[in-house]
Amino acid sequence: MNATEQAANGDRGTTRSAGGRLRYLLHAPGACQLMGVHDGLSARIAVAEGFEALWASGLCMSTARGVRDSDEASWTELLTLVGTMTDAVPGVPVLVDGDTGYGNFNTARRFAGRAERVGAAGVCFEDKVFPKMNSFFGDGHQLAPVAEFCGKIRACKDAQRDPDFVVVARTEALISKLPMEEALDRAAAYAEAGADALFIHSRMNTPQQIATFMERWEGSTPVLIAPTTYHTPSVDDFAALGIAGCIWANHSMRAAFAAMRDVCQRIRTDRGIYGIEDQVAPLKEIFGLFDYEGLEKDENCYTQAPDLAAVQG
């Protein structure tokens, strides 16, 4: 029984791979939540707080690398960061934001293959041309031809090793201010090409575009969204529309950004740290998250001198 069949039968049993677990979540009743992360620390925190799946955000990883979300970081750099996430939270599904696939079908399938090898559950590619700009900045978002993008999807599906590895197709038609018909047509074409899930993106400040899309969507392929700008509805509200998953794409990084900026300002202004201790995490919380006590126990176990008398009989 594959992960899709498990979800249909209400079976929450473990699956063989991270891809299988993500596939299960996308087909289970309701809308799953994927927390945006950018490194091993943010992944550990998200999982410790109960998230069952993670989104390795291109914006957040690029920002953590100190560059813009405009394909300035190489895909090998980003997948190195993804590896820190899968190492930090083994078994937890990580869906990787693969931007446009960094070129043609060949670079897209190479990206997907490398993501699979570092332990990711799946990849998501968007239908803009390379190089891209972040969807929430500016208006110059040119889309790739449908046939070209479908070729990327097919190439990735043909090359995957794990049958449960998830390939998500993201359309930027609404971001590019194209008609709803264009978004629906592209979604249908991408599903036909083999996409395991669809990501419908909007930057309106209400969910109306998403609601309209779901009312008119006749396919069975799961639909993901990232409600970054239309942030009033709850997960349950989106589930009622038929959404399979909500991606909280960049909130962890933005929270860290604000906290780091504020503490830097405070220390510089106060010329000391006497006023910030109650605003930062205690070291014991960090030691606890990374199981320092476990390491100490292992040291006692593995570095004690052997009892030579016992060894010699």
From Swiss-Prot:
GO biological processes: antibiotic biosynthetic process
GO molecular function terms attached to this record: phosphoenolpyruvate mutase activity
Reactions it catalyzes: phosphoenolpyruvate + H(+) = 3-phosphonopyruvate
Gene3D superfamilies, per database record: Phosphoenolpyruvate-binding domains (3.20.20.60)
Listed CDD domains: ICL_PEPM (cd00377)
Pathway: Secondary metabolite biosynthesis; bialaphos biosynthesis
Enzyme class: isomerase
EC numbers on record: 5.4.2.9
Alphabetized UniProt keyword annotations: Antibiotic biosynthesis, Isomerase
Tagged with keyword Isomerase: yes
One Pfam family recorded for the sequence: PEP_mutase
TM spans (from-to): none
PANTHER family: PHOSPHOENOLPYRUVATE CARBOXYLASE, PHOSPHOENOLPYRUVATE PHOSPHOMUTASE
The protein's role, per its UniProt record: Formation of a carbon-phosphorus bond by converting phosphoenolpyruvate (PEP) to phosphonopyruvate (P-Pyr).
Protein family per UniProt: Belongs to the isocitrate lyase/PEP mutase superfamily. PEP mutase family.
Name of the protein described by the UniProt record: Phosphoenolpyruvate phosphomutase
Annotated source species: Streptomyces hygroscopicus
